[in-house]
Amino acid sequence: MLPFFLFSPESPGQNLDRKISLDLNNSSLEETLVRLAELGNFRFSYNPGALPLDRPITYRCRKKPFRLVFDELFGSYGIEWLEVESQIVLKRSHSEGQSGNTVRAGPLPQHTVSGFLYDIKTGEALIGTHVMVRPLGKGTTTNEYGFYSLSLPEGMNEIAYSYMGFREEVRRVNILKDTLISVNLTETSLGMREVVIRARDNEQLPAVNQPGDFNFSGAVLERLPGFTGEVDVLKALQLLPGIRSFGDGSALYYVRGGNNDQNLLMIDEAPIYNPSHLFGFYSVLAPGAVNDMEIYKGDFPARYGGRASSVINITAREGNRKRFSMSGNVGPYASSLTLEGPIKKDEASFLISGRLSTLNWMNYLMDNTSSFNLYFFDINAKVNAKLSRKDRIYFTFFTGRDEFNRFTNSVYRTYGISWDNLASTFRWNHVFNPKLFSNTTLCFSSYDYNLFLSSDRKNYWRSSVGNFTLKSDLTWFLNPSNTLRGGFSVSRYHSNPGNITRQPGEEEEQIEVREVSQYTSMEYLIYLGNEQKIGKRLSLNYGIRLPVWQDFGPASLYYFDANHQVIDTVTVARNTSYATFFSPEPRVTVGVALNDISSLKASYSRTTQFLQLLSNATGPFTSLEVWAPAGPVIQPLKTDQVTLGYFLKFASSRFFLSAEGFYKYFRNHIDYADHANLLYNPLLEGELRFGTAWSYGLELMLQKPAGKLTGWIGYTWSRSWMETPGVNEGTAYPAGFDSPHNISIFLSYDTRKRWSFSANWIYMTGNPVTSPVGFYELNGSTVPLYGERNNDRLPDYHRLDLSVVYQLNKPGKRFRHNLSLTLYNAYGRANPFSVSFNKYEDAQGNFLVPSNLEGDYQLVPTTISVAGIIPSINYQFKF
């Protein structure tokens, strides 16, 4: 067959180094050659019978030299190109592994490229790094350990590695077999780092973003104006649509109409039952120890469960594998110090971060009638070691403690409370082969809450909860469009719902002791999930989670009649099972990319929660922590959620817009009898009522991720309702955390020199409360009369936080330090968190509690709020 010549009219000389932009969409090879000949004034010579001229081609590039375009374009089809005098000769390649511009002919075999992504300065694994093969349109992201895997055709491939705040790294690799490629990325200047809350998965491929799921990187957390000048993980959550806090002085947060105990927060896979310090003003996570934070408030991947509303997975930093480093934050309310460095360079490292409160100086500002002792501390530590190219181990340890005691000179004296968190995790990563990755975890977590009942602190009411878990997770990268995840876990839980602890020989002090049964439970779990892309527009993420829950003795079980009176008592022997639950949890997400900048998502998920927090407190300082498992009386909480989302990038990807609607339905939802007694009550379950709940809402978010001015605006409209037989006359009423309108605004301005400024503003509809509908006289006393539950609301909550940071060092210096000024609640808004109706106002305008109720008092509502403006000046350093 005679050769075929395709040439331009003028047939000038070649210019293979000239750059072009090209956009081909299902063009045939023949049409592509015509286009290239016109663009570059090229003459192509080839045998038409030897080339797949009808094969469709989709290819995009921007400002690439013709030489590289030919490599990528022709190499994908096993075509060899050669420059011979004034023409480009094309022919099928018949040799393997040739140098130059040749690629293997025929149907190309697939090979797997896998490896890890690291920060070149610290050796820290980079989570969520984008790995893209641009000519093929294939891509993936690194997992929580920085690992990735891609199947690519044999031959020359261009792989781009990109991570927010780091320079892109591009590798041209001739793939002839399964290949391990680990890459170190270089951080850009801090002034240029983007501030963006990434939707999970690859932001270059909208079709794989999960509805309701977000990720906070370190770049985001660094710029948020945290309480008293310190970055705070829990405060950052309040800025996301669909997540709201209780208010000041509380660590409680609520996700899409779920209660606060329906949120699972983990540090390196170990659950933290109370993630707060100082009644929620600080989180238990020192910012120097946080590497990455995933937030799932939509459908959870099948590997996550145990809670009904959200999962927050925090990955602790691993420590600098290159050199020793120290950083710290010195402030008026708390100070922290972080040490990290290599144990063996590039092979093993450590990190230890500690924080201690410095609050006792505030006693000098108080009057002589009262004083308090309030302190907290926490320690985060992590060690990791590379055993081989395929094995790495991690050990994480966390402990934290809070204590609050207030003493007065009056007859009334409060002895105080304390709470402790302890968690540790041992993990082993193993790469079986380039497509199969495993992680095995052994973790322990416990939480204790103490209410002191005597001045010597030897008698106290104590509740606790803890778990011990063994789990294994496997990830099988079948191909770039299909990833299979599966695993199992076995967990043992122990819960003490509240008993009095005494030291030997102590007097009774007129405190009645009633033994409350403790709980022991086991959970067995297997799960399987699949992340799949079908074509260029459709993505699926589906799976199933199969948990089994069992309760074991010893225990004393109480059974109640319809009037909640005890009708039977059963004593269960040790290690005897008395309740078993099995609850399959299907999850599915479907995504459709409408075009290159917009996509739609829909999801359905079922979650089951076997362990629940019992509390009828209405304020943040009165909560008694009681955790109880599902059993003969308490049924597992089951939640079904559907979501629909729309995602858009516009203005050349300078702005991101998301809109999501959701509906959740809760079965076996716990409610409480009026004036329920949960304090060392052996008949605790008789105070509970069970019904249904539902929530629905719309969440909007607009982000500007890059430039000197960055930030986002979030708005949520939502409602949360409860309906329980025997409560509120069986009619529906708003949940205690129902808040129809929530607005969050965050702005950050970086001068790219030494100054940076940030601000956030939060607005929430006031929390529902139950107010008296009238008062009546009984035996000379004024008694409030209550109507429907949650028939009123506190005033709306809003707060402005401001922060300014001045960099003391010149750019490029190893020793970096700065001063920051933060104003929490900058305009001094008094945001009430509780209201009471037991006081009257005297002639001088003072609010007093009547010494006796046999008087003509006009009771008035009074509220309690946290102090107004809270300023802080902090000094931060790092070297």
List where the protein language model places each region.
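Short, acidic, small-residue-rich periplasmic hinge/interaction motif at the N-terminus
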Residues: L33, L39-G40, Y77, E83-R134, ...
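Periplasmic N-terminal accessory/gating domains of Gram-negative outer-membrane beta-barrel systems
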Residues: K138, G165-R167, E194-F300, V311, ...
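Surface-exposed extracellular loop regions of Gram-negative outer-membrane beta-barrel proteins
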Residues: D448, H494-E508, E512, Q550-H564, ...
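Outer membrane beta-barrel strand-and-loop segments of large Gram-negative receptors
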Residues: N467-K471, E515, P629-Q635, Q641, ...
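Signature of Gram-negative outer-membrane beta-barrel scaffolds
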Residues: V490-S598, F610, F621, V727
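C-terminal beta-signal and adjacent terminal beta-strands/loops
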Residues: R754, Y763-N779, Y797-R799, V805-F879
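Short, acidic Ser/Thr/Gly-rich low-complexity loop/linker segments typical of extracellular
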Residues: L136-F147
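Gram-negative outer-membrane beta-barrel transporters
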Residues: F662-Y665, L684-V773
